[in-house]
Curated annotation (Swiss-Prot):
Domain of life the protein comes from: Eukaryota
Gene3D superfamilies in UniProt: Chlorophyll A-B binding protein
Principal subcellular localisation of the protein: plastid
Gene expressing this chain: PSAN
Full protein name: Photosystem I reaction center subunit N, chloroplastic
Length: 112
């Protein structure tokens, strides 16, 4: 009864080849993504570490004196794009590393 219902929905008889081919194609795509992920692991770890340091620095920029008025008038993020602000400038540079020119997230306008 179940087989007849499935055949009716698809308009043709199912066989193992269709299912295997689909599963194989999905496995190939998965393997490709896994390889890309492994290849980018070192860069991604570096980016996470830089972001962690930058987030800490953002919380204390005024207290540490790295982003004080009047230089931070438009914000410490903008100041870090213009001059060296510890941790934040490094994070902004690393964000674009390994990416195409127009895919640098928040930094797309100042990197080129």
């Amino acid at each position: 009864a179940m087989r007849n219902a499935i055949e009716g929905m698809n308009g043709k008889e199912l066989d193992g080849r269709n299912i295997t081919t689909t599963g194989s194609a999905k496995a190939t795509i998965f393997d490709e993504y896994l390889e890309k992920s492994k290849a980018n692991k070192e860069l991604n770890d570096k980016k996470r570490l830089a972001t962690s340091g930058a987030n800490f620095a953002r919380a204390y920029t005024v207290e540490f004196g790295s982003c004080q008025f009047p230089y931070n008038f438009t914000g410490c993020q903008d100041l870090a794009k213009q001059k060296k602000v510890p941790f934040i400038s490094d994070d902004l540079e690393i964000e674009c590393e390994g990416k195409e020119k127009f895919k640098c997230g928040s930094n797309v306008f100042w990197k080129w």
